[in-house]
């Protein structure tokens, strides 16, 4: 009697297979980048694409988890080229340091404000869709306190 082994979906894929999956996602994202009318980095498109593939189940977590963890653990090494390009651009930075610092501060504040608003919107939408009992209870208590 021959027993066929079924491939377990939760079993992690071979490391090389995981590298191929991530490389294909990056390749497709670079193709998408070349057709985009606005400049957007291929790596950002790849992150969104991989997220969508994971959410839809087209790619299983086990197919990218080990390589993804390895890349995340060594992310400092991946920023070395960006750091070197900043050092090479010190001449440009030294021409308008206050402008650059101001832009960094303003963009950080805008990012925090936008993140807060988006978080509030998401929390409202999810509480409405689930019919959150805690939210209803708080609203009832607030209404009684005002009466």
UniProtKB/Swiss-Prot annotation:
GO terms for biological process: cytolysis; killing of cells of another organism; programmed cell death. It is found in: Cell membrane. It holds the Pfam family LrgA. Keywords: Cell membrane, Cytolysis, Membrane, Transmembrane, Transmembrane helix. InterPro entries: Antiholin-like_LrgA, LrgA/CidA. One of its GO terms (cellular component) is plasma membrane. Its main location: membrane. It is a multi-pass membrane protein. Disulfide bonds: none annotated. The keyword Membrane applies. The chain crosses the membrane at residues 12-32, 35-55, 74-94, 98-118. PANTHER family: ANTIHOLIN-LIKE PROTEIN LRGA, HOLIN-LIKE PROTEIN CIDA-RELATED. Inhibits the expression or activity of extracellular murein hydrolases by interacting, possibly with LrgB, with the holin-like proteins CidA and/or CidB. The LrgAB and CidAB proteins may affect the proton motive force of the membrane. May be involved in programmed cell death (PCD), possibly triggering PCD in response to antibiotics and environmental stresses. Belongs to the CidA/LrgA family. LrgA subfamily. This is Antiholin-like protein LrgA. It comes from Staphylococcus aureus (strain MSSA476). The gene is lrgA.
